[in-house]
């Protein structure tokens, strides 16, 4: 039995989630809420500058999209409470707008009839469970929560990495820097922004700014609260980012032992270890949350460790959104099966 999902928002993440979800046999994309006509949405799904041509053909139809024999209803309403989720029997509303990341706002999808909500960004408050695959997904609780957050792309990268290091060697403290590709939050040319550095042209400079990844990490790895802090450098590339993590460990280790810990972590599909001397473009459309750059692992004084982890901040993250949606759907199905028996 497949899970009925609706996607609110057709920006970068919304479109990538749609591409991935359409090829997941456990998910049924029923509806999309977006402000653009079907022709525009279909074109931007079929053709993508960063990730290339889609291997399925998405065609515009009246008030919707069609992929083979599958039809997707297209609606356009900026108030989620007005959306036809009850009528369409939506199990999970995936909100990819970034506008409803507070639980008090996201609950509008529940009021509209969706059983659960999944946010494609870190929660800004309210009764929301933050879930990161490979970190705390075993604690996903559909009884206690109706709204879930898939955190950020950076938290999805650093989370599994920090968990492995902490479990194997113990983290005393550390600092992280994410070297992050351009996002829609930046300006192509100088224009006002509440962050004056992000007000500057994203194509011309390396831009130091903040990241919420270390703060969000405490939501999924509470044992590391107060132990990690960090910042971001926005760089003029279109996609693929990395986390540069430096930590002091409780145990003395070698670089080989650190890399082996990631190899043996058992996080298939989440962490990958790369031994080739690659560059950012080589990780474009890589579905993993974190790709350890084994050649860059360093150890100093026995317990000070530097780890570089690459991540496709669009495609890798969107894969995790779909994974979490699939997990929520499976739990809903199991609950309904038990209730019916």
UniProtKB/Swiss-Prot annotation:
Belongs to the glyceraldehyde-3-phosphate dehydrogenase family. The gene is gapA2. Pathway: Carbohydrate degradation; glycolysis; pyruvate from D-glyceraldehyde 3-phosphate: step 1/5. The keyword Nucleus does not apply. Homotetramer. GO terms for molecular function: glyceraldehyde-3-phosphate dehydrogenase (NAD+) (phosphorylating) activity; NAD binding; NADP binding. It is found in: Cytoplasm. Its EC number is 1.2.1.12. D-glyceraldehyde 3-phosphate binds at residues 152-154, 183, 198, 211-212, 234. GO terms for biological process: glucose metabolic process; glycolytic process. It holds the Pfam family Gp_dh_C. The record marks 180 as: Activates thiol group during catalysis. The active site is at 153 (nucleophile). Catalyzes the oxidative phosphorylation of glyceraldehyde 3-phosphate (G3P) to 1,3-bisphosphoglycerate (BPG) using the cofactor NAD. The first reaction step involves the formation of a hemiacetal intermediate between G3P and a cysteine residue, and this hemiacetal intermediate is then oxidized to a thioester, with concomitant reduction of NAD to NADH. The reduced NADH is then exchanged with the second NAD, and the thioester is attacked by a nucleophilic inorganic phosphate to produce BPG. The keyword Transferase does not apply. GO terms for cellular component: cytoplasm. NAD(+) binds at residues 12-13, 78, 120, 184, 313. Keywords: Cytoplasm, Glycolysis, NAD, Nucleotide-binding, Oxidoreductase. PANTHER family: GLYCERALDEHYDE-3-PHOSPHATE DEHYDROGENASE 2. InterPro entries: GlycerAld/Erythrose_P_DH (IPR020831), GlycerAld_3-P_DH_AS (IPR020830), GlycerAld_3-P_DH_cat (IPR020829), GlycerAld_3-P_DH_NAD(P)-bd (IPR020828), Glyceraldehyde-3-P_DH_1 (IPR006424), NAD(P)-bd_dom_sf (IPR036291). SMART domains: Gp_dh_N (SM00846). It catalyses: D-glyceraldehyde 3-phosphate + phosphate + NAD(+) = (2R)-3-phospho-glyceroyl phosphate + NADH + H(+). This is Glyceraldehyde-3-phosphate dehydrogenase 2. Its main location: cytoplasm. Coiled coil: none annotated.
């Amino acid at each position: 039995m497949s899970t009925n999902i609706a996607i609110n928002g057709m920006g970068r993440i919304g479109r990538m989630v749609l591409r991935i979800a359409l090829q997941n046999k456990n998910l049924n994309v029923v509806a999309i809420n977006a402000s653009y006509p079907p022709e525009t949405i279909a074109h931007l799904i079929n053709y993508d500058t960063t990730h290339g041509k889609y291997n399925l053909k998405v065609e515009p139809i009246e008030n919707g999209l069609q992929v083979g024999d599958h039809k997707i209803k297209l609606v356009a309403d900026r108030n989620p409470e007005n959306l036809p989720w009850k009528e369409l029997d939506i199990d999970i509303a995936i909100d990819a707008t970034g506008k409803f990341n507070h639980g008090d706002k996201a609950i509008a999808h529940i009021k509209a009839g969706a059983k659960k909500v999944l946010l494609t960004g870190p929660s800004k408050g309210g009764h929301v469970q933050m879930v990161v695959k490979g970190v705390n997904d075993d604690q996903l609780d559909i009884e206690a929560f109706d709204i879930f957050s898939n955190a950020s792309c950076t938290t999805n990268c650093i989370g599994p990495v920090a968990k492995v290091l902490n479990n194997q060697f113990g983290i005393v403290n550390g600092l992280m820097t994410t070297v992050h590709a351009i996002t829609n939050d930046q300006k192509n040319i100088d224009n006002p922004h509440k962050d004056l550095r992000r007000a500057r042209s994203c194509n011309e400079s390396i831009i130091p700014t903040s990241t919420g990844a270390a703060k969000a990490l405490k939501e999924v790895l509470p044992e590391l609260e107060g132990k990690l802090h960090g910042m971001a450098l926005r760089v003029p590339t279109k996609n693929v980012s990395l986390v540069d993590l430096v930590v002091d460990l409780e145990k003395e280790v070698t670089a080989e032992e650190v890399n082996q810990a990631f190899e043996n972590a058992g996080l298939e599909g989440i962490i990958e270890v790369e031994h080739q001397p690659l560059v950012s473009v080589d990780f474009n459309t890589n579905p993993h949350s974190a790709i350890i750059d084994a050649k860059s692992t360093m150890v100093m004084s026995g317990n000070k460790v530097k780890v570089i982890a690459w991540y496709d901040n669009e495609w890798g993250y969107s894969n995790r959104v779909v994974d979490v949606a699939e997990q929520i759907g499976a739990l809903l199905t199991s609950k309904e099966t038990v209730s019916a028996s």
